[in-house]
Amino acid sequence: MKFNFCLVFFPCPCYFSTVVYYVNEQCTMLKYALPLYPVVDAIDESWSYEHLDKLTKYNEFTDTQLLYSNDDVRDFNNTSRVPMPHQVLVANYTTPKSPVEGVLVVHGVGTGKTMTAILAMLNNINVPGGLKRGLVLTPNRAVLSAFRDELHAYYKSRFSDRHVNEFEMEKYLSETFAFNTITSFANTIDRTADVVLHKEWNATFVVIDEAHDLTMQGVDYPKINGFLKLLTSRKILLLTATPMRNNISDLVPLHNLLMRNRTHDITVEQFNRDMVVRINDVNDVYTVEKPNEYFRRKFAGLVSYLPSNGRDALDVNIVQVGRTGVYGLKYTHVVEHDMSDDMAMVYRTVDDATRNDRDVALLRQRQVSRFVFPDGTYGTTGYQSWMDSKTGRPKRKLLDALRGGASDRAAILDNVAKYSPRYAWIARNVIEAAERGEKSMVYDDLVTGSGLLVFAAVLEALGLERGTGKGAGSFLCLTREVMTVNAIVSAIKNIQQRQQLRRFRGRYRVRFASHRRSITLKDVIHEHVVAHRNDAETEQIIGRGIRYKSHANTIANWKSSTRPNVFIYRHATVDSRSPNTRTVDILMLATSERKRLNINSAISALSSVALTCNGCNPSSQTPPVPPAYRGYYKGVDVSDDNTIPLDPPRITNSFIVKLDEEFDFRRQNVTVKVDSLLKLFNLDPSSVEALKMLFVIMNTIQTHGQLDVDKYIDCNGQYVTISKCVDEFRQRPTFVYPYLVRNTSVYGVGVYRDALAESVITPNMMRDIERSVTTFPYPIDKLPVMVLQGLLETAIVTKGVRDPYNTLGDMVQYYAYGDNDPDVEAAVWLALAAGEGQDYRILTTVGEDGVRRDRYWINCPNRYVDRVVRMKSEREAQINDMVRSKRLKYYGTKNPTTGDFCIRTVPDGSPTNRRCVLTGRKCVTWTSSKLREIGSGVGVRVAANSPRKATCSAIEQEFGRLDALFAYVSCGVQAKRK
């Protein structure tokens, strides 16, 4: 029987369904023809609860094996490589066919985030239609090396039979996966044109490890954010165990990195105004922040959440040692150490001498609370007198003083307690543990002169040997002050060996990020940590020694039926002589608790709308529990009508066959006309149905990396790349390209960004085009102000702008052509960045006489001046408040174009402060004595004869570590005299 049929389209805000009508009027869905997945809301790139409910009924969410791998059977037969359910979940959601383009992976320390990213990349790149390569960005070289080694090891163990020999496999890996540090890659972005970046990196699977390092104030964040938005075809994984460290607003840059369009980015100001509710506590000590419903909607479907204690992967019991409910602390277990008389006297002296300078007082009190040298000095002064600055080892006189003429351990420890009761207690604990064959890890902040190396001196005074960790009576001190990265990596390999388990191994690490984030220690039974201002930092440190399968050797030697214990000690030095006074350690723990209350509320909100692996149990002998969607709202009851199974071929193969009838996609440069493309599907190119079909076709082409080469399509006589047609057609009703704007919304102008970027960088060219164009207006003055701001920011931070100050001056007329808040805010941003006051113009349609006419440019109206000045002051005040909260007197700014580093003074209202003419100047123009003072205030040791350039470099690094370094285009640019 011959059937006649026609193709009918039903428009839908989330996807297009295709229905075939047969002669017998029976209607059946075309299986394997078009994707029926829901998609994100185009208005703000967030998922509706209804769409999440639908999405979580599909195979990606419920299957416990990788959906698009032919090697699952072989892989699952090897129990050491069985992916855990939460890893499978993320890998399946980021396949080429999945509508999920980016995920913030908030999985706790020790849950295997590295392997999650590896599986996700392999489950995409190795799949037909997948992306062409992977890019892994890490915070430092040590993490980079560990990530690369793990990926190579996994790939070789699983796919070695795909390659002829080892050389070919290494070549494939080096060509397919790129590794770089975040800062290094950001610098590459800064000096590379957008068109080159797009050509090289489009269709890339991007993984950013420790993504929380990209802060709004950081220099690297705007570069990485801009780079990701250049890519028309990509998947993004942001890995972090601690997305929030100080405030809930730490989530803002992580949200923005996942957005495809700049118009959907949010600012910290918008976040604090619209997405959280603030409630002051009864004592008005701190502000309670609770996420609202808008917060949940913005992050819905963008997060995969799994807490460290949410997995049953730990084959050990975690025991928190110490008391709770002391000194006003509610939840924290504290191991208290009472100051000796000598230490208490010095501590009170510091408090009295620095009472008017609280930030200096806290720094010095932290030094005193750790160790006071025999002559009553502490910090840098004592360190220089009693320690060898080059080797980090104690001088003979310090060892003699610590021993106090005694020879037995107990007497020496009693003597050490006079200088540091904390170090004496920890030393006794780790030695006794070592004698039982138990490993210990001690983490101490690098508090100048009183930190890790001084504690190592205490162990040497007790007769232990500081070495590489091989000797039975030795200990290992991991610190960048005296060891290279290679030496640290080599030492860790020694201490991880199983045969070394019964030997003594002290574990000591400094607060250098490159090692805190890259070191993993196995079979640690005792973990000693210091007080921090946030629990996130403590959690990361503890996680270095407690991870999935980290205690396999301990369990193998365990003789009991119960699980072994791992003990956590949070140390705090207190003063029993002043029971009503909280020491610096207690203050830090209290601050940490307060921050944790707000962070917990945000985590709860995130988990309620996350793609969460609920009930994952990788260590259990029972089958893994499928993931579950823990929705804050269940939304509508959407039935599982996904008629497109995820394993058979769907649109890709059938569509490519039709394309090959018209032209060969295997050639590097090809062209196809819209008319002929639509006729392949028997559609009239001028019909509405054809436009709807073209939407689906173009969207499919763009999301398949293997098709993303130099392909061109004829859009009304303009030959442009397919991806540009796709971007344009997604938001606009016509294919007119590139300059005529009709029916363009705020969210539809993204297609013009690359067309205008060069013009923005060269303003004179843009003005020439405006004067020469007569047939239709050049669209630059019609674009929404948020798009203009994005274009300008792109131009400013690229090397194409030789003088950002003059560029801003030339482009100032394109800001703020209305009287609404976004327009004025854009003008304020421009004035703040340029270091100017009110030197800008506004495009208006109302003259001074109140008569409406065509748009024309006028100078800033007087009614705007006060408002702009106020908003600019508020913007500067926000930065100052942020720095004051860190108890700093100064902060750094860096010009993203020139690389100049400047220092600004935090205003405090004093006459001296107001007269500070140096504030905001380049660091190298400050006096050497002033630089030494600034360095001392942030813990940087500056020698008297140190060159100013070297001093500035050290201060810049410390400001960056303290999140007190901000991008500022006026840094190094001489502002005009008023």
From Swiss-Prot:
GO terms for molecular function: ATP binding; ATP hydrolysis activity; nucleic acid binding; RNA helicase activity. It is an enzyme of class 3 (hydrolase). Residues 94-261 form the Helicase ATP-binding domain. Coiled coil: none annotated. Keywords: ATP-binding, Helicase, Hydrolase, Nucleotide-binding. It catalyses: ATP + H2O = ADP + phosphate + H(+). Its EC number is 3.6.4.13. The keyword Hydrolase applies. A motif (DEAH box) lies at residues 209-212. Pfam families: DEAD. PROSITE patterns: HELICASE_ATP_BIND_1. The keyword Metal-binding does not apply. SMART domains: DEXDc (SM00487). InterPro entries: DEAD/DEAH_box_helicase_dom (IPR011545), Helicase_ATP-bd (IPR014001), P-loop_NTPase (IPR027417). Signal peptide: none annotated. ATP binds at H107, G108, V109, G110, T111, G112, K113, T114. Belongs to the DEAD box helicase family. DEAH subfamily. This is Putative ATP-dependent RNA helicase. It comes from Spodoptera frugiperda ascovirus 1a. The lineage of its organism: Viruses, Varidnaviria, Bamfordvirae, Nucleocytoviricota, Megaviricetes.
